[in-house]
Amino acid sequence: MKTIAVLGSTGSIGTNTLDVVRRNRHLYEVYSLVAGQNIELLTGQILEFRPKLAVVASAAVLDLLTASLQAAGLPKSEWPDLLSGDAARVAAVRAPEVDTVISAIVGVAGLEATYEAVCLGKRVGLANKEVLVSGGSLVMEAVRKFGAELLPVDSEHNGAHQCLRAGNRAQVSRLILTASGGPFRNTPVSELPFVTPGQALNHPTWKMGNRITIDCATLMNKGFEVIEACWLFDFAPRDVGVVIHPQSTVHAMIEYSDGSVLAQISATDMRMPIQYALTYPDRADAPVPKIDWAEARKWEFLPPDLEKFPLLKLAYQCQESGGSATCILNAADEIAVEAFLQGRIGFLSIHEIVQETLSRMPSRTPASVGDILEIDRESRTLARELANCRAAGTVTA
């Protein structure tokens, strides 16, 4: 029986994780649930899975959760311990009973708790890209030092992990990640300045949170995945390729030195990579449709347009640069995406704000989680100023 902490239990990955647990009660027990402020959903999760600990974002949200549990009629003796704030997220993974952590909190808010789990030598199913994009060097050093298992949950890296099991890592020449191309794959460049947040949120394949959906529209998300792959699998950026695959059925490919290519192919259902991270090195039946190989189908593979989607190119450059560049990249992108979703800036201004933030922020090498969080904070402050200037129609010097 594995005991699990779910960081981000009310998000897409969190709810899918709990669905895997629901179908495999004999294998998994939920020890702690960490959420933001979706009280209705968290209350339902507490009633169903009976965790020992539940954590929310703030004291105000904690009061709402307390009232919700009272209204649900759950006897006080059956309540989990209720906590709030950053330190509580760390406590959720620190408990000795927890052996597996699913890291699915969006943004750097999940970094400290994930790093703590790694330092405690636990298995971490990583769905939070920002952990490695912002703190890859620090986190991977801790993985090696403390013997933690870091298993990717997102479909592309999970697919790469499966393919890499089939051969000798020293004989691998290249990793290839696939991308759907997003909603603007066929949109002329001349129309991109006028696209709306509603159009950008219309992802052709996956249902996800707003920020990651916009990042898919700009291909920034694929850039983050390139950075993440470099850290997870020890690849140089030049050895990680990206191809547009609109059907989103092939998730990743590994090219070996003899020219052979292994691909991981599956239905587009996040429960598969989540379950893989929980059951590895074993496999279990999954409640997802299998591919019918007798059915006629067409798969396309196309090169990405780096002029049309410059944030993907910028991600490669930041990973090559090292230091704090990828941390700045992530922070600035989050602020720019937020401004776009609010209708304050145009779609193309996302890249402009990220690029300008990178050019203005000094490069340094973070030596601790505190350093990473400080760089993130400074980058957000600058990016927000730049976004405000664009929203006001002024030019920054």
Swiss-Prot record:
Residues the record lists as binding Mn(2+) = D154, E156, E225
Among the GO molecular function terms of this UniProt record, one is: manganese ion binding
What UniProt keywords apply to this chain's record, in alphabetical order?
Isoprene biosynthesis, Manganese, Metal-binding, NADP, Oxidoreductase
At which positions is NADPH bound? T10, G11, S12, I13, G36, N38, N128, E130, G209
First-tier enzyme category under EC: oxidoreductase
What catalytic activity does the UniProt entry give for this protein? 2-C-methyl-D-erythritol 4-phosphate + NADP(+) = 1-deoxy-D-xylulose 5-phosphate + NADPH + H(+)
Among the GO biological process terms of this entry, one is: isopentenyl diphosphate biosynthetic process, methylerythritol 4-phosphate pathway involved in terpenoid biosynthetic process
Q: Does the keyword Transmembrane helix apply?
A: no
Q: What is its EC number?
A: 1.1.1.267
What the entry lists under InterPro entries is as follows: DXP_reductoisomerase, DXP_reductoisomerase_C, DXP_reductoisomerase_N, DXPR_C, DXPR_C_sf, NAD(P)-bd_dom_sf
Cofactor names from the entry are:
Mg(2+); Mn(2+)
- Superkingdom: Bacteria
Residues binding 1-deoxy-D-xylulose 5-phosphate: K129, S155, E156, S180, H203, N221, K222, E225
* Listed pathway(s): Isoprenoid biosynthesis; isopentenyl diphosphate biosynthesis via DXP pathway; isopentenyl diphosphate from 1-deoxy-D-xylulose 5-phosphate: step 1/6
> Entry's HAMAP family?
DXP_reductoisom
Please give the family membership noted in the entry. Belongs to the DXR family.
Q: What does this protein do?
A: Catalyzes the NADPH-dependent rearrangement and reduction of 1-deoxy-D-xylulose-5-phosphate (DXP) to 2-C-methyl-D-erythritol 4-phosphate (MEP).
Record-linked NCBIfam families: Dxr (TIGR00243)
Q: What is this protein called?
A: 1-deoxy-D-xylulose 5-phosphate reductoisomerase
